């Protein structure tokens, strides 16, 4: 999907940037909301946020959405 890391032809694909996610309306405008992959969407969070270039870590998964 747009956010999680995946591999294409053996090369890792980078996590979609915050700006691109906002442009695509993937992230909610208000912080703390869950989006389709279960990450909390907060621009100002340190490492591990789905809308940051660092990607999304387990810490920010919303309950019950890890399988999405």
Curated annotation (Swiss-Prot):
Compartments, record wording: Secreted
Post-translational modification remark: Contains 4 disulfide bonds.
Main subcellular location: secreted
Protein name: Conotoxin Cal12.1p1
GO-annotated molecular function: toxin activity
Domain of life: Eukaryota
Free-text note on domains in this protein's UniProt record: The cysteine framework is XII (C-C-C-C-CC-C-C).
A Gene Ontology term for the protein's cellular component: extracellular region
Propeptide: 1-23
Expression across tissues: Expressed by the venom duct.
Sequence intervals crossing the membrane: none
Keyword annotations: Disulfide bond, Neurotoxin, Secreted, Toxin
The UniProt record lists the keyword Disulfide bond: yes
């Amino acid at each position: 999907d747009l956010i999680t890391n995946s591999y294409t032809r053996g090369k890792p694909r980078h996590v979609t940037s915050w700006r691109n996610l906002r442009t695509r309306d993937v992230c909610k405008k208000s912080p703390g909301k869950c989006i389709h992959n279960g990450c909390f969407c907060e621009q100002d969070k340190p490492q591990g946020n789905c809308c940051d270039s660092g990607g999304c870590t387990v810490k920010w998964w919303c309950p019950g959405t890890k399988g999405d």
